Amino acid sequence: MALPRLLSAVAAVAACAVLAGAPALADEIQEINLQFRTGDLGGALDHANRYLAQHPKDARARFLKGLILADQGKTNDAIELFTGLTEDHPELPEPYNNLAVLYASQTRYEAARNALETAVRTHPNYATGHENLGDVYAKMAAIAYGKALALDSGNAAVQTKLTLIQNMLGEQARKQAAGKPVPGASPPAPAR
């Protein structure tokens, strides 16, 4: 299955604009983002931590640190960080989206669904959130159909539905593994 995606490094720059802050500090955020995009995850994390020691409430730096932690495989730390962002900035859909991605990676689909439903409720035009919510629903449907088939192995209708969803989820995974771009990673404009 192709898990819903985290905002890409390129989209992180745009997300930093959404998570607006003081222009004088933007250069340092851009430096951290450059380190992140070029794969210097350790350097980016150290830089983000130094920056956040001086600016602990900076949403842009916190968001970027969450992306870095997720890329480093520090899922629980990233979940804690994105959860804090949702508490401090409940109007922003991106932290909810990334929480959902992390929950889905842990097969916590109910938590992922809840986070994505909040993201699209706070920002109904957030296409990435709707797409990822569809992916989570599809995975949950596959699990339910699998359970139904385990209870009634002769049910051809359930087998057909399960096969369709597995094919859809498998096609998404093949496209991502082949490095084909996945549409819709742009964060929305700030809510007014």
Question: Locations of the language-model features?
Answer:
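Helix-start (N-cap) detector for alpha-helical repeat units in TPR-like alpha-solenoids
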Residues: 25, 59-60, 93-94, 127-128, ...
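Register position in tetratricopeptide repeats
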Residues: 37-38, 71-72, 105-106, 139, ...
